[in-house]
């Protein structure tokens, strides 16, 4: 399921890249939605690896990838409650270079890359392996933010990844 989620996110990002440069482009967004349950896997865990890989691949070309989990309540930076998502989804959209880096405070290198991003048409997969398992291994080597995982004593950086 992770492979399909990653593939759908990459397709959404590639679909958006040429559209963002057109009129109204910065307002475009594609949502990759997961409906139903995956036996034995929480959506939070299912989204973790594909989300991290997509952020690192597409942030440097100005694409922001987020993640929201069904029913999860969050608080905005200003302290206001954010309505719970009705479904789990990955929003894939044009980055707002002045504001989005603030969402990446736990990964300063990625924040800098997003703030200065310019889509020059590069192949974001040119420098990464194309084999699925090798791509997962490449992603695991990227610096992950050190923050507690919800409901767990481990950090997100040290957690075990499904299928690894």
Predicted regions and their residues:
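Expand to "…catalyze enediolate/carbanion chemistry for C-C bond making/breaking, isomerization
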Residues: 1-164
């Amino acid at each position: 399921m992770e492979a399909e989620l990653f593939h759908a996110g990459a397709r959404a990002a590639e679909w958006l890249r040429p559209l963002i440069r057109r009129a109204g482009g910065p307002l475009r967004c594609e949502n990759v939605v997961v409906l139903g349950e995956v036996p034995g896997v929480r959506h939070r865990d299912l989204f973790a690896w594909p989300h991290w890989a997509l952020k690192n691949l597409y942030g440097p070309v100005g694409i922001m990838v987020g993640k929201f989990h069904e029913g999860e309540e969050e608080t905005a930076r200003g302290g206001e409650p954010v309505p719970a998502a009705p479904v789990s989804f990955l929003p894939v959209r044009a980055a707002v270079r002045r504001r989005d880096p603030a969402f990446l405070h736990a990964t300063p290198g990625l924040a800098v890359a997003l703030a200065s991003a310019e889509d020059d048409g590069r192949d974001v997969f040119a420098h990464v392996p194309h084999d699925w398992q090798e791509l997962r291994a490449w992603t695991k080597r990227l610096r992950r933010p050190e923050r507690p995982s919800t409901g767990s004593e481990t950090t997100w950086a040290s957690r075990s990844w499904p299928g690894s």
